[in-house]
Design a protein with these regions (language model features):
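Catalytic alpha/beta active-site cores
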Residues: 25-322, 327, 346, 353-360, ...
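Intrinsic-disorder-associated, low-complexity terminal segments enriched in Asp/Asn/His/Tyr and depleted
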Residues: 2, 12, 16-19
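Short beta-alpha connecting loops at secondary-structure transitions
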Residues: 165-168, 233-243, 276-281, 319-324, ...
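Generic, well-ordered alpha-helical scaffold segments in large soluble proteins
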Residues: 117, 126-133, 177-187, 208-212, ...
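Flexible glycine/proline-rich, aromatic-decorated loop/lid segments
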Residues: 307-311, 349-363, 371-400, 407-432, ...
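Flexible, glycine-rich loop/tail regions that form catalytic "lids" or insertion modules at the edges
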Residues: 40-41, 46-53, 59-76, 148-150, ...
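Phosphate/diphosphate-binding loops
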Residues: 175, 200, 239-259, 336, ...
Length: 608
């Protein structure tokens, strides 16, 4: 049986060490014990054919939520019975229907296209291309989103032996403050919002960015953008972590605290479900794990003594828009409702902007196929529409060739034009939450919410339990439900189970993937232009880095690195010392290692 539907890293780990993802009780599980065509009559429940034990794809969503054939006023969903409490009007608590009464009539979503490859100069050129494609009188609210290469994501310099062969391959290589200057050269960073997709070394990259702004004489209060900075989901799904969960969470709080005091227009963390979904989770798991990660950061900030009204309005979220059209819309509606209630009722926030969930949405990379890649344009268009109908504040549309390599300029342009057609030709911007009030949509939103809340309760109970005000002075980061869930392997196990189930459904033909398991073209020509990165990029980047190190004042650099160690050792906020480190020409890898000298590096898996 072909296991191609399990994400590659996840599949390889399951096959070679099933206990790591699925727990010791599953260690002897055979991944391929029966043929997919063999009925499994032990399975039953809503949406399952009792004769075959197989799902009815017309009755169950991708996430396994059973659907009725039709919805009528004879069985109104709970939310419609309690309209003001559960749904209300757009712009009114609990914001199920959106944050603002006029929706996209007064402000379109930000068209934020992800870009990054090769050197800082290469990516700067792509940034300028993207800005040029969006600079019109009707679409001025654009932003940049930066993809970093694997060495940068792991906090390693380009000349590190572990970086060899990866420099500039899946994103841009950033080692120094000079790289940061080249990356944003001739771009008015006080006018364009900048998103940085970086997590484990997020505090260091952000420090370099702030130091660059200082050298350009741009006040920090003029900077707008978003730092992804969501380290918890790295332990759940993406595996790009450096420090232990407790120290990693502390660094997130450092950035949140520094942002609230010095960079008021910046979103200090983008709490990300996208990667959780890409790893194979269901929509409800994505929603629950993302919200609970956000709650973990809120609780860590309260333990630090921060004022919730100071930091909560700048928290943001990042969700996936997958193929199950209505489920994705329901997910975003339920997300706003749950978050608003948690912030108001559980954490006591009074300012309505602290209740707001601002969301960025990206179409589902894991849904794109190598086979018949032009079909991906259609997939992305529908997914983008789901994100918009769900009320996102910004949107990234994937390029159709991203399963094959880095996107070409033509593919990037088509992806961007998809958003522009959606915004200006379809009419979806004219009415806020146009599906609101639908018997089906409200019932599905309720169902997604209920399943997500059940997951959140499980995670709460793995730690200190549901938040109480006294925990601000009696608890620590170590007691958080997410931190404890990481150590117990909860998140990886749940994601692996969902991923494996979806894989089986696809291979059995229960889930049709056009061009892959149905409507296959045996004579298909897959010759699609792809963007490749020359080995010369790495050679030049390493040479430039070594020249940078040779010309700096080593005594100043050494003193700055020691200051970073001292701040970490004394449990201080590391941001001021990191900014000074960037100004003293410390490299990314050096500053990351200075903190690793104190916090250590996390190499262990779940404690099973």
């Amino acid at each position: 049986m072909n296991k191609a539907w399990i994400p590659l890293r996840l599949r390889d780990t399951i096959l070679h060490r099933p206990d790591f993802f699925l727990g010791t009780e599953y260690a002897q599980m055979s991944i391929n014990t029966t043929d997919a065509s063999t009925p499994n009559t032990s399975i039953s429940g809503p949406g399952i054919n009792p004769d075959t034990g197989k799902i009815d794809p017309h009755a169950v969503t991708i996430s396994g939520l059973a659907l009725d054939a039709s919805y009528t006023p004879d069985a109104l969903p709970t939310s419609l019975v309690n309209f003001e409490r559960d749904i209300n009007n757009p712009g009114e608590f609990p914001y199920t229907r959106g944050l603002f009464p006029q929706g996209y009539r007064t402000r379109l979503w930000t068209m934020r296209q992800f870009a990054g490859f090769g050197s800082a100069d290469d990516t700067n050129e792509r940034f300028k291309y993207i800005l040029a494609q969006t600079k019109t009188k009707t679409a001025a609210n654009t932003g940049l989103s930066t993809a970093f290469d694997l060495p940068t994501l792991m906090g390693r310099d380009s000349d590190d032996v572990l970086s060899l062969g990866e420099v500039g391959k899946c994103g841009v290589a950033i080692d120094t403050i000079e790289d940061m200057h080249r990356l944003y050269a001739d771009i008015p960073i006080d006018q364009v919002t900048v998103s940085q997709t970086i997590n484990a070394p997020a505090c260091v990259i952000w420090a370099m960015y702030l130091a660059m702004a200082k050298q350009r004489n741009i006040a920090w209060d003029q900077l707008g953008g978003t730092l992804q900075n969501d380290i918890l989901k790295e332990f759940h799904a993406q595996n790009e972590f450096i420090y232990p969960p407790e120290a990693s969470t502390k660094l997130v709080v450092d950035t949140i605290e520094f942002q609230s005091q010095h960079v008021p227009k910046w979103n200090s963390v983008s709490i990300s479900g996208y990667h959780i979904r890409e790893a194979g989770s269901s929509a409800t798991q994505e929603l629950a794990f993302t919200l609970r990660d956000g709650m973990e950061y809120v609780e860590a900030c309260l333990i630090r003594g921060l004022d919730i009204e100071e930091f909560a309005p700048r928290l943001s979220f990042f969700f996936n828009a997958h193929n199950e059209f209505f489920e994705e819309i329901a997910k975003l509606r339920a997300a706003r409702r749950i978050w608003a209630r948690m912030m108001k009722d559980r954490y006591g926030a009074k300012n309505k902007r602290s209740w707001f969930m601002k969301t960025h949405v990206q179409t589902a990379g894991c849904s794109l196929t190598e086979q018949q890649p032009y079909n991906n344009i259609v997939r992305v268009a529908y997914q983008a529409m789901a994100g918009v109908l769900g009320g996102c504040q910004s949107l990234h549309t994937d390029s159709m060739d991203e399963t094959l390599g880095l996107p070409t300029e033509q593919a990037v342009t088509i992806a961007l034009r998809t958003q522009q057609i959606l915004a200006h030709e379809t009419g979806v911007t004219r009415t806020t939450d146009p599906l609101g009030g639908s018997y089906f949509m409200e019932a599905l939103t309720d169902k997604v919410e209920a399943e997500a809340l059940a997951f959140i309760e499980e995670i709460d109970n793995m730690g200190r339990g549901p938040w109480k005000p006294e925990y601000a002075t009696t608890s620590t980061i170590d007691d958080g439900g997410c931190v404890q869930g990481i150590h117990k392997g909860y998140f990886r196990r749940k994601i692996a189970e969902a991923s494996y189930r979806f894989s089986e459904e696809c291979e059995a033909g229960d889930r049709v993937i056009v061009g892959v398991n149905e409507y296959v073209d045996p004579n298909e020509d897959r010759q699609v232009e792809i963007l490749s990165i020359s080995q010369e990029v790495e050679t030049v980047q390493v040479q430039t880095l070594q020249e940078f190190k040779a010309k700096r004042d080593t005594a100043t650099t050494a003193a700055a690195l020691q200051a970073i160690r001292d701040a970490a050792r004394n449990n201080e906020n590391v941001m001021p010392s990191l900014i000074e480190g960037a100004l003293a020409n410390c490299t990314l890898g050096e500053m990351v290692q200075a903190m690793a000298d104190i916090y250590g590096r996390y190499t262990g898996g779940p404690e099973w």
